[in-house]
Amino acid sequence: MKRIFLLIVTNLAVLLVASIVMSILGVNTSTMGGLLVFAAIFGFGGAFISLAISKWMAKKTMGCEVITTPRDSTERWLLDTVARQAQQAGIKMPEVAIYQSPEMNAFATGPSKDNSLVAVSTGLLYGMSQDEIEGVLAHEVSHVANGDMVTLTLIQGVVNTFVIFAARVVAGIINNFVSSNDEEGEGLGMFAYMAVVFVLDMLFGILASIIVAYFSRIREYRADEGAARLAGKNKMIAALERLRQGPESSAMPAQMSAFGINGKRSMAELMMSHPPLEKRIAALQSR
């Protein structure tokens, strides 16, 4: 209940701040053009702010320890492997980090190909063979080389803009309908209008999540293919087979999970950021 209350308060606060900012900028959101500008600024703005702080956020939320000076042979091997793969992929050496987690997972993040982070869990680092880890690292390096962080940010910006725009257009239609059937012609009123916008934001947000998840799954297949080129198909398949034997990924926030090696499983594949491991293995075997 507390989480729902905080979500509602946060959404209302965002709407209030957005309205104040757009008023200062002189954008008239009562027109379609003004509303579209409003939606684009906040839709893309939020997505790109998330991208800009993605490395910092990952380090803070996951407790990542960036390897500057290797403490043992395992960390030295980890750095050398990422450096070799980054050179093969034609990108600048990412920062390499380790975070404490018993689950086997890894992720890549960062605002650009030349400013990225590859992080692995302790569960993966000490629970997989070196060949399997090499496949995982190649997958994450491929995410960076393919520019997946920027690509999905652009997609997120587009769907954010759609959600903000569509929710307010539909809320306006509902408000006009209520106003035309109201003797006083007052419509919904401010609080009722904001409540309608909130509900529509949630509904359209679910649709937007399906679209983003679809593109995320496509990028996962591409990262698997890239990993097969960098580390070899057999190592990538071995890594996925090992992940299939393990428990479901659960500890990673959604923003990092989208670029992880092992995503959360879902009853509805439409909502999954990663294809099922079985399908990924089959796709590699058919290459």
From Swiss-Prot:
Broadest EC class assigned to this enzyme: hydrolase
A Pfam cross-reference name: Peptidase_M48
Entry keyword set: Cell inner membrane, Cell membrane, Hydrolase, Membrane, Metal-binding, Metalloprotease, Protease, Transmembrane, Transmembrane helix, Zinc
Residue ranges crossing the lipid bilayer per the database entry: 4-24, 33-53, 154-174, 195-215
GO molecular function: metalloendopeptidase activity; zinc ion binding
Record-linked Gene3D superfamilies: Metalloproteases ('zincins'), catalytic domain (3.30.2010.10)
EC number, as in UniProt: 3.4.24.-
Annotated membrane topology: Multi-pass membrane protein
Active site: 140
Cofactor binding note of this UniProt entry: Binds 1 zinc ion per subunit.
PANTHER family in the cross-refs: PROTEASE HTPX (PTHR43221:SF1)
Family: Belongs to the peptidase M48B family.
Listed name of the protein: Protease HtpX
Annotated source species: Shewanella oneidensis (strain ATCC 700550 / JCM 31522 / CIP 106686 / LMG 19005 / NCIMB 14063 / MR-1)
Organismal lineage: Bacteria, Pseudomonadati, Pseudomonadota, Gammaproteobacteria, Alteromonadales
